[in-house]
């Protein structure tokens, strides 16, 4: 692996983005090259170590996919250390140099997390990150830029926080730098890779929010000939300030992260985007970004996908704010309570985007074989069919998004009948056992 750096000095991050400088060494093809952003740029992981991302080039096309990895979120001490539960902020030790090539991290486990020694990038989390996956997708022949998440803020934060709720004697200083890191990656691509004939911004889970937040940043800096968005299982649901949690179940979460991650503070992502695109969004409602993007970029195709039975993103969204969920005695009862809120939010989310012809969506009911129906594009594309519409898997939606030859596909499964009753029942049972032990 070739170590690579992108910037020689720090510039004002509230003004123009840093310009890239020539790299040390020579880029390879069809191999993962590490890019490390220097500390002087303001980039870092949550623990203060350097932010690193990875590039897999091809000489045969300028088309490029940027992958924003999933990996949870955090706004308390144990979650940011990725301790006590799997459902916290991932990569609490930072990003290892061997992140994409070895399952075991080369970093010391300084956070004490039982999960951090595993390199998620080497797990094959998505077919989009593999040129040889049996789940085929057009972008496997493109240039691939893979962005790990290590800041616990779904790529949107700009705040140094101190958390001491779990251990007041040993407070944790945590760097929510996701917004800064992401903009620096965009600038690196613009300075070090050819202008893409087509740029796909793709993210799953936490990364799905990341690509939504930073779509405009990457478009402005990289200036691709054509650009598309694929956001999988990380929705920004309607949550206007001043609303009620009964009507908008994600409101307590949004209120919390605004403060914890500095979203509304000077230099935060909300005032920054509103200053750049005046009048296009509503500062009181993070979900206004969902409709701002198709307004700003009417010629770009934007696709959103999730599962109606996703208990994982629902748990992240609601568990810390609704005591009745955590106090329910069984995981089945907890999931039922989660999904009541989750499914209530899907309708208004889709309704807000329906007026825009460049927006499409693919919403199956369940995919029990993957993380309690979390994500349509993780690991494989299997079990993502919508039989009532004759759609065999999510790849039909992805091809429609990328080809651009027809109106955007809009597919929503109305049936809740299991596609494979016996298999789904067994998988759900195993998932319940697993997730109870992981803290769900």
Predicted segments — roles?
Residues 18-19:
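Hydrophobic helical h-region of N-terminal Sec-dependent signal peptides
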Residues 2-14:
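Bacterial N-terminal signal peptides that target proteins for export
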């Amino acid at each position: 692996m070739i170590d690579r750096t992108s910037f020689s000095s720090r510039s004002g991050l509230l003004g123009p983005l840093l310009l890239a400088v020539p790299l040390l060494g020579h880029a390879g093809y069809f191999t993962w090259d590490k890019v490390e952003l220097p500390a002087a740029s303001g980039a870092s992981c949550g623990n203060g170590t350097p932010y690193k991302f990875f590039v897999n080039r091809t000489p045969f096309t300028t088309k490029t996919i940027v992958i924003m990895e999933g990996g949870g979120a955090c706004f308390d001490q144990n979650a940011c250390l990725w301790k006590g539960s799997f459902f916290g902020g991932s990569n609490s030790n930072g990003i290892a140099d061997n992140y994409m090539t070895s399952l075991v991290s080369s970093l010391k486990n300084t956070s004490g997390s039982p999960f951090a020694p595993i390199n998620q990038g080497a797990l094959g989390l998505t077919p989009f990150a593999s040129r040889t996956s049996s789940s085929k997708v057009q972008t496997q022949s493109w240039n691939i830029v893979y962005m790990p998440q290590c800041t616990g803020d779904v790529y949107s934060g700009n705040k140094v926080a101190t958390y001491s709720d779990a251990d007041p004697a040993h407070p944790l200083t945590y760097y929510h730098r996701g917004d800064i890191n992401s903009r620096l990656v965009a600038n690196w691509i613009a300075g070090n890779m050819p202008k893409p004939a087509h740029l796909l911004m793709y993210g799953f889970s936490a990364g799905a929010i990341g690509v939504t937040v930073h779509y405009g940043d990457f478009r402005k800096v990289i200036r691709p000939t054509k650009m598309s968005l694929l956001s999988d299982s990380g929705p920004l649901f309607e949550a206007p300030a001043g609303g009620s949690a009964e009507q908008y179940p994600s409101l307590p979460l949004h209120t919390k992260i605004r403060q914890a991650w500095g979203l509304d503070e000077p230099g935060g992502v909300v005032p920054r985007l509103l200053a750049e695109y005046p009048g296009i969004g509503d500062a009181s409602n993070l979900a206004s970004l969902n409709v701002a993007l198709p307004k700003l970029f009417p010629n770009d195709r934007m696709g959103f996908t999730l599962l109606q039975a996703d208990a994982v993103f629902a748990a992240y969204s609601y568990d810390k704010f609704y005591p009745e969920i955590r106090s329910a005695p069984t995981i089945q009862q907890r999931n039922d309570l989660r999904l009541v809120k989750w499914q209530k939010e899907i309708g208004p989310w889709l309704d807000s985007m329906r007026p825009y012809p460049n927006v499409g969506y693919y919403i199956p009911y369940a995919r029990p074989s993957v993380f309690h129906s979390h994500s349509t594009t993780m690991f494989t594309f299997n079990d993502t069919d919508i039989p009532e519409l004759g759609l065999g898997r999510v790849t039909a939606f992805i091809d429609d998004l990328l080809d651009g030859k027809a109106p955007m596909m809009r597919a929503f499964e109305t049936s809740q009948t299991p596609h494979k009753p016996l298999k789904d029942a067994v998988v759900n049972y195993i998932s319940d056992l697993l997730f109870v032990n992981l803290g769900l």
